[in-house]
């Protein structure tokens, strides 16, 4: 399953050079291509780090060492939930932050006259599921037929490598920039967004923000809102020989699943923004985890499930929370047991409102022009049915943010992989963007 809506075209960049405006830009692109092995090697080293929730330290260390080796000035930004708690974008989480951190690399401006840029990418990855279902161990990355396989290969460590080396390419080609550039590698993108938020709270922003999410060489203009929630239920335990006298908490989840599915259907049909009207089912409910019971021969007294639900731009987090709580309450009131033992709803993790962007923003226009210089045609718009860290920059900074990234398949699934030529396309486009947006200095 690919995240990219189109067909990727392998571009002959000797022909594409005809669209590039000057010799300086041609030299930059040639330098990017000379760094192909470095970009792939960096991706392999990042993917080899199993940076699931709470285990990101290895990947962060690899990132920090690479930035320092390439001459960036680095700063660690701790993920401190207590310090972030008062921020309107903060997402409460039940897990501890400990000493976990994000890492920032900076290249200062060498002159004035350009506009600042920030590249953001996340180092955390989702769990690999059942490793035995993979062709190879998920954190032993390998390359086959132009694709790099491994958990996080597409989502989104290859993009992190591409954005890092796009900045380095200008330095290697002998060019400075007339505005500062920030490379930002964060954690908790997959669950809360607090990593990117911590960097924003620390003062890191720019006039343009590019995120190489694996949606292909497209320009993201719209994304849905997303939230997580947990529903806990109580039953009445008993030995199975007297099962009818007990109340099975796990089975009491079933009508709630049905009610939430009905809510999902209603949300997909109500106040649909123009960008989503041609989509068959843009909003999705996922019952992602279920827990309950402690013995096969005991009617379970407790059960809970965790879910993710998306909602359209224009609906805010508080409103959708109220709708979910109302849906659960109305369903429970129809059950003789649940109406006296109401399910408990807890919201945690993502509280991410959706948003829409104009393609006419100068940063998006410049990015599109760079894409056209390399491909000869305009980049497609991407209408996202998931959330990204883009939302934090949209809501809490004055940046012009979007996503433009490589082509990946099976993200969050088995045998996740990324197309390596598309990774190089990202690096070329980003380097060209820096030259035009930040302006060259030599």
Please annotate each region the language model reported.
Residues 1-19:
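N-terminal amphipathic/basic-hydrophobic helices that include classical n-h-c signal peptides
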Residues 18-27, 34, 69, 230-442:
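Metal-dependent amide/peptide-bond hydrolase catalytic core
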Residues 148, 156-228, 438, 442:
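Acidic/histidine-rich catalytic neighborhood of metal-dependent amide-processing enzymes
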Residues 148-161, 186, 247-251, 417-424:
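Short, conserved micro-motifs enriched in small and acidic residues
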Residues 128-143, 221-232, 370, 402:
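Acidic-glycine-rich active-site phosphate/pyrophosphate-binding loop
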Residues 93-97, 220-223, 276-279, 381-383:
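Short Gly/Pro-enriched turn/cap motifs at secondary-structure boundaries
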Residues 18-148, 177:
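Acidic/His- and Gly-rich active-site-bordering loop/insert found
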Residues 133, 176, 220-226, 296-300, ...:
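Short glycine/proline-enriched loop/turn "hinge" motifs that connect secondary-structure elements
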């Amino acid at each position: 399953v690919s995240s990219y809506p189109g067909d990727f075209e392998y571009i002959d960049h000797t022909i594409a050079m005809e669209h590039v405006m000057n010799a300086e830009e041609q030299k930059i692109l040639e330098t990017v291509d000379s760094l192909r092995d470095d970009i792939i090697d960096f991706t392999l080293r990042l993917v080899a780090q199993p940076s699931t929730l709470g285990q990101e330290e290895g990947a962060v260390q690899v990132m920090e060492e690479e930035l320092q080796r390439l001459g960036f000035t680095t700063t660690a930004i701790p993920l401190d939930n207590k310090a972030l708690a008062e921020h309107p974008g903060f997402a409460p989480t039940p897990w501890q932050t400990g000493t976990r951190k994000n890492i920032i690399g900076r290249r200062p401006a060498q002159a004035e006259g350009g506009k600042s840029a920030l590249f953001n990418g996340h180092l955390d990855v989702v769990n690999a599921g059942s490793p035995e279902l993979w062709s190879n161990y998920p954190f032993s990355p390998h390359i086959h037929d132009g694709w790099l396989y491994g958990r996080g290969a597409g989502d989104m460590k290859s993009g992190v490598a591409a954005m890092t080396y796009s900045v380095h390419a200008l330095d290697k080609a002998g060019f400075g920039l007339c505005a500062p550039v920030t490379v930002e590698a964060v954690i908790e993108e997959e669950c809360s967004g607090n990593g990117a938020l911590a960097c924003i709270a620390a003062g890191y922003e720019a006039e343009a923000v590019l995120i190489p999410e694996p949606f292909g060489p497209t320009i993201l203009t719209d994304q849905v809102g997303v939230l997580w929630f947990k529903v806990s239920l109580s039953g009445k335990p008993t030995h199975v020989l007297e099962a009818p006298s007990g109340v099975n908490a796990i089975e009491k989840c079933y009508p709630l699943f049905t009610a939430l599915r009905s809510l999902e259907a209603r949300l997909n049909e109500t106040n649909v923004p123009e960008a989503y009207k041609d989509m068959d089912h843009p909003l999705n409910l996922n019952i992602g985890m279920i827990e309950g019971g402690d013995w096969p021969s005991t009617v379970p007294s407790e059960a809970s499930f965790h879910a993710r639900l998306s909602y359209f731009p224009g609906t805010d987090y508080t409103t959708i929370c109220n709708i979910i709580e109302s849906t659960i309450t109305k369903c429970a009131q129809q059950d003789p047991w649940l109406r006296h033992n109401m399910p408990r709803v807890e919201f945690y993790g993502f509280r991410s409102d959706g948003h829409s962007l104009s393609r006419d923003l100068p940063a998006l226009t410049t990015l599109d022009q760079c894409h056209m210089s390399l491909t000869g045609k305009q980049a497609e718009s991407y209408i996202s049915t998931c959330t990204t860290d883009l939302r934090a920059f949209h809501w809490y900074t004055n940046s012009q943010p979007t996503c433009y990234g490589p082509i990946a398949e099976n993200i969050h699934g088995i045998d996740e992989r990324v197309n390596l030529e598309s990774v190089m396309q990202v690096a070329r486009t980003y380097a060209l963007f820096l030259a035009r947006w930040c302006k060259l200095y030599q």
